[in-house]
Amino acid sequence: MTAVSQKTHTPPANFLLFRIAFAVFLTYMTVGLPLPVIPLFVRHELGYSNTMVGIAVGIQFFATVLTRGYAGRLADQYGAKRSALQGMLACGLAGAAWLLAALLPVSASVKFALLIVGRLILGFGESQLLTGTLTWGMGLVGPARSGKVMSWNGMAIYGALAAGAPLGLLIHSHFGFAALAVTTMALPLLAWAFNGTVRKVPAHAGERPSLWSVVGLIWKPGLGLALQGVGFAVIGTFISLYFASNGWAMAGFTLTAFGGAFVLMRMLFGWMPDRFGGVKVAIVSLLVETAGLLLLWLAPMAWIALVGAALTGAGCSLIFPALGVEVVKRVPSQVRGTALGGYAAFQDISYGVTGPLAGVLATSCGYSSVFLAGALSAVVGILVTILSFRRG
């Protein structure tokens, strides 16, 4: 009877999970489309420094960090669906600020300020979206399949980066920054329409500790996740300028290589954290990420840099679900949304801090040096993971 019941209910649950993941893909294009364009816009069109490029990219993630606690409480207390849909709306509003930056006849400083406002709104929306969809998906398929939920969401996120990066550069080069802004306004509305009828899941009853008390349970996997995040942050922030400084074409396809390898790994091996546990998977993944970043650092030509980006994407792919499985094991169900929000915040902090610091490093030592810094961070991540879980 149990087997029959599982066969009856698993396909609908998986289909609902697919709908949620596809909506994440559409909404996260608001991150993927402008990611390679913003450094070029800030550096070449507005005339600001590499440090300001890092701030423009990284400040989104600080906004995400600061609203993770709110997103987790919203998902836990009022329902994950509300959090996810609210995030989609905010991501669409970010495009409106960028449209103003593109069209208003104002100074470069005002345009930069409007760009920053849009990035802050996008960061707020991202925290609601990702915390909501993760908690929503686990409510649909159960915590025993938490690795699958995180894998599907990750495929959607990095699939959006893979598709969005070259598309964003194409839109910007042919139609300008205003067209890019309009596109980012429209995609979350499509996601809302596609996802709005998916059933909501009830909030869990029970005592709800604060985010900071939950952090005490999750900081070890969170630290490993943060050190992993440096690699993606330096690629996302400086790969366009790195390629331009070397006279290489296809900068947008570097993020496609990263995202494509990321998604492929999730598709082929996303089951591994649930099957083998997160620690072993995380250590191997960090080794692969290290190799990819070293290849980017030493790349003498564009195609080798593309291979390095793909290796980095393959390495980063399974780390979030691998260490996330350890998070789910450590917390009660009624604070799962808060815990996942806090866990993801470690990665957001990494992204936010890396941008400006890598900008200073790039100015002093050249763009290639930021990839060496990412590789060293991944090595430290391996050591931290081994030491943190050595008794497990």
Swiss-Prot record:
The chain crosses the membrane at residues 22-42, 46-66, 88-108, 121-141, 151-171, 174-194, 223-243, 252-272, 276-298, 342-362, 369-389. GO terms for cellular component: plasma membrane. InterPro entries: MFS, MFS_dom, MFS_trans_sf, MFS_Transporters, MFS_YfcJ. It is a multi-pass membrane protein. Its main location: membrane. Gene3D superfamilies: MFS general substrate transporter like domains (1.20.1250.20). Pfam families: MFS_1. CDD domains: MFS_YfcJ_like. The keyword Transmembrane helix applies. It is found in: Cell inner membrane. One of its GO terms (molecular function) is transmembrane transporter activity. Keywords: Cell inner membrane, Cell membrane, Membrane, Transmembrane, Transmembrane helix, Transport. HAMAP family: MFS_YfcJ (MF_02091). Belongs to the major facilitator superfamily. YfcJ family. PANTHER family: PTHR23517:SF1, RESISTANCE PROTEIN MDTM, PUTATIVE-RELATED-RELATED (PTHR23517). This is Uncharacterized MFS-type transporter YfcJ. It comes from Salmonella arizonae (strain ATCC BAA-731 / CDC346-86 / RSK2980). The lineage of its organism: Bacteria, Pseudomonadati, Pseudomonadota, Gammaproteobacteria, Enterobacterales. The gene is yfcJ.
